[in-house]
UniProtKB/Swiss-Prot annotation:
Region of interest (Disordered), ranges: 118-144
Record CDD domains: SANT (cd00167)
Domain HTH myb-type, residue spans: 9-61, 62-116
Function (record text): Transcription activator involved in the spatiotemporal regulation of flavonoid biosynthesis specifically in the corms of Montbretia. Activates the promoters of enzymes involved in the biosynthesis of the flavonol kaempferol and the flavonol-glycoside kaempferol-rhamnoside.
Record's protein name: Transcription factor MYB1
Lineage top rank: taxon: Eukaryota
Main location group: nucleus
Any one annotated GO CC term: nucleus
Lineage, uppermost ranks: Eukaryota, Viridiplantae, Streptophyta, Embryophyta, Tracheophyta
DNA-binding region: 37-61, 89-112
PROSITE patterns assigned: HTH_MYB
Entry annotated with the keyword Nucleus: yes
InterPro entries, alphabetized: Homeodomain-like_sf, Myb_dom, Myb_TF_plants, SANT/Myb
Species of the source: Crocosmia x crocosmiiflora (Montbretia)
Length: 248
């Protein structure tokens, strides 16, 4: 068996309340007090349902109801209470003086509920991952890793040879040293035949001539074109020695 309805719903006014109906309801409640909502319409002379009379009084006509828009502080309090209590609007309204449960429920369904849902959905949304365009086998950009990587050289074919100036200078110095060695050998050869030349020159001149054969190496180096020959001419050698005496 279900609960008995408060009225038969026949011949009842529906829709917006008129100002005369509000005045009759307020006067009756002030005289007899709240309660007994099933029999109140009949005793007050209203063609309204008992439930409709109760909601009209609690949500609009009772004293102490706060009129106007809900402030930001009240919004924050409603959000926190809803997180704790859920959709228990009567308990939430009991902690907001001057606000009715019906008003808070309507404000939540039209404004706060959608806003809180969008904020929570935005916070729970994962950040999109940025795909990297680097190849899979690319080494990481690390100085230590790059330093330890092996260096692979590419084979190249040598088509030309280049000699630096230092190499040319070394060749020139070696050539000069070879020339000095050759001059020294020539000087030693001349020194070994010195006594023979002195004797032959003395016989050719016809007098006892004492010729100093101590020819220096520096003097022989002045003659770049001088070369020792096996068939040397004694007369030309004597002329050469005379020129040596004139120098000294």
């Amino acid at each position: 068996m279900g609960r008995k309805p408060c009225c038969s719903k026949e011949g009842m006014n529906r829709g917006a309340w008129a100002s005369m109906e509000d005045k009759i309801l307020v006067t009756y409640i002030k005289t007899h007090g709240e309660g007994k909502w099933r029999s109140l319409p009949k005793r007050a002379g209203l063609k309204r349902c008992g439930k409709s009379c109760r909601l009209r009084w609690l949500n609009y006509l009772r004293p102490g109801i706060k009129r106007g828009n809900i402030s930001e502080d009240e919004e924050d309090l409603i959000i926190r209470l809803h997180n704790l209590l859920g959709n228990r609007w009567s308990l939430i309204a009991g902690r907001l003086p001057g606000r009715t449960d019906n008003e808070i429920k309507n404000y939540w369904n039209t404004n706060l509920g959608r806003r809180v849902h969008d904020q929570s959905h935005q916070h729970c949304r994962p950040n999109p991952t940025i795909t990297s365009t680097k190849p899979a086998d690319a080494p990481p950009a690390n100085a230590n890793t790059v330093a330890t990587m092996p260096v692979r050289t590419k084979a190249a074919r040598c088509t030309r040879a280049f000699f630096s100036d230092d190499l040319s200078d070394q060749k020139e110095v070696a050539a000069n040293n070879d020339g000095l060695d050759n001059k020294k050998e020539e000087f030693d050869a001349v020194g070994s035949i010195g006594p023979l030349l002195q004797e032959n020159v003395g016989n050719a001149v016809g007098e006892d001539t004492n010729i100093d054969m101590a020819v220096s190496l520096d003097s022989l180096l002045l003659f770049d074109s001088f070369q020792v020959d096996d068939g040397i001419n004694l007369q030309s050698m004597a002329a050469l020695l005379d020129s040596e005496d004139q120098w000294f």
